[in-house]
Amino acid sequence: MEKELTFYSAGLKLAGTLYLPGNLQPGDERPTVLCCHGLRANRKVILPEFARAFAKQGYVAFVFDYRGFGDSEGTKWRLISKERDEDIINATTFLGLQPEVDADRIVLFGISYGGANVISAGATDPRTKAVASIVGFGDGDRWARNSRRLWEYWALRKRIEKDRERRVLTGSSEYVDAYEILIPTPAEEKFYSGSGQIASLKSELPLETAEDIMSYKPEAVVHQIAPRPLLLIGAELDYLTGFEECVSLYEKAREPKQLHILPGISHYETYSQGFDTVMRLSLNLFGQALGAR
């Protein structure tokens, strides 16, 4: 069963979908997985398959659109990382008010950029009982630098500086094609074309977002998740964020922590070929953190 819901974050109405297990009985309160989407995605891309799989295992799962994305209110396609963290924290509060949710057993599950967001939000919010970060990153500037040739990186830096001047003079940021910030890979085009979801991902992003991404460093706070358990999953052939980002996060995190690099697959194949492994590892983590359902 699925329920469409809305809640507010910073005065903006955000849209979400609640996935309920089939064996839910009146009065039941279940452990809940809050699922967080990637950079330019929305709640209808990739995550519904994971949410339904969690529900089949007896969990409640919730997927929502960050402000400015999907069906949520906010400046369209404007991504500010700390605002996304705030949306996650407010979603946690909202979930705790739902009759089907055990407010004391909420965990975070994030993919790609959402994998970075769940680390910083989980580190900030002690209500989070466990964090699963899938093909995320720890340092936005390092990611931006490593995904470009050096001259391209510095050219982007120069554009960002000019845009900062523009914003203080005009109050607006220049919007550019998302692929000028998020360098595309052949694996991405193949995955989304095959899934039929490519149209829903067409977007432009403000250069303000590029500046924000490059200043975002979840690895600076990842140690604060402990003593709650952390799961980091990377992909050996991840040419988008690079599995080294997961390794760096792992090195800076404290126990209890797990790191798994899935062999022979790309960033996007983590959601298809790697799906069963991601689910198995995540369910093991959540089961240990939350106890029997």
Regions found by a protein language model. Give the residues of each.
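Conserved alpha/beta-hydrolase "acid-adjacent" motif
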Residues: 239-245
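Catalytic active-site module of serine/aspartate enzymes centered on a nucleophile-bearing elbow/loop
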Residues: 265-268, 272-293
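The serine-hydrolase catalytic nucleophile loop
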Residues: 39-52, 66
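Catalytic nucleophile-loop/oxyanion-hole region of alpha/beta-hydrolase
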Residues: 42-46, 69-107, 271-274, 278
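Alpha/beta-hydrolase-fold enzymes
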Residues: 117-195
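Short beta-strand/loop motif that positions the catalytic acidic residue
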Residues: 225-226, 232-234
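N-terminal cap/lid segment of alpha/beta-hydrolase-fold proteins
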Residues: 1-28
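Conserved alpha/beta-hydrolase
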Residues: 53-71
